[in-house]
Amino acid sequence: MKMDAYNAVGIAEGFVEAESEEQVIEAWQYLHDTGLGYQLQGFFGRTLQRLIEGGYVHA
């Protein structure tokens, strides 16, 4: 699946099924890299912060 805004948000919210755990991380990395994750509701920014602190998403 090509990662774009729709798929990244869909995977993060659970209405698009990820093909693997790696794709879930790819979706969150996309949301961080594009800044979209910080423009959406607070859940996204808080989750990104935890994923960065855990070393799953690279800042």
Task: Kindly give the residue locations of the regions a language model identified.
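Catalytic phosphate/metal-binding cores of nucleic-acid and nucleotide-processing enzymes, i.e., regions
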Residues: 1-59
